[in-house]
Amino acid sequence: MTPSSLELTVLGAGPAYTNRLGSTGAAYLVRGGQTAILLDLGQGAFTNLAAGIEPSTLTAVAISHLHPDHFVDLVPLRHYLRYEFQPPRRVAVIGPAGLASRLDALHDQPGFAAVSLDVTDHQPGPVTIGSLSLEAIRVQHTTDSYAIRVAAGQGPGLVYSGDCGRADDLRPLIRPGDTLLAEATYGTDPVAPGSNHLNAHDVGRVAAETGAGRVLLTHVLMGRDRGKAVSAAAALVRVPVDVVDPGDHFDL
């Protein structure tokens, strides 16, 4: 790995519910040099995290929004750091306002998260995390949802949509050549009114218009044809398009 390169390992790529065996909630491990940033940690994804790396070596976890399929496995991460090490080890977590109190409420225990997670809110503009930069901007989904860009130096980065109901919200983050990891919840189907999600056509269009260098589709609902979703996005953009699964690895 060169100083300006990134690696992406998919630990989870599922939506809130699915019948696909082995599917887990959103979790994407981005590494550059000695820095490891985890984007989201949804239901069931901690197992894949722990099978792949020592979780306590994470430089940071960045959470896109406060829906359980994107953050709930912070609970097993907290437990692991608390009970497998004496004294407990700590990991930085960046997320929407209220994340720590949401975790505390799950256990009806004030200070539950703070035992081993250093939780802070997303801030405007790029921030430096180890050797990487991270920038989060608000997108339409919940009242406090974020898309996130991770980059190493001036090279192409990774833009993660989180859950997003308006593809144009991603434009400020995407630089020419970036990899766009974007939800295509509805596959090729029309997006249900008020759902605040995207389909493959939305993703392909914004990727083409912003000069993305690669498209990775994720978060596709059960019953939607994933192959057709890839074809629909690929028809709109002249770059590689794939749909991701746990265990997939990409050199960006």
Task: Outline where the language-model segments fall.
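Active-site neighborhood of phospho(di)ester-bond hydrolases with catalytic His/Asp-centered motifs
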Residues: L38-G42, T59-D69, P96, L158-G162, ...
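Cap/insert and terminal regions of metallo-dependent hydrolase folds
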Residues: A167-D251
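Short, solvent-exposed loop/turn segments at secondary-structure boundaries
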Residues: R20-L21, V115, V191-N196
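Short helix-capping segments at alpha-helix termini
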Residues: Y83-P87, P110-A114, A235-P240
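Metal-dependent catalytic neighborhoods of phosphoester/phosphodiester hydrolases
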Residues: D73-L81, L106, D225-A233
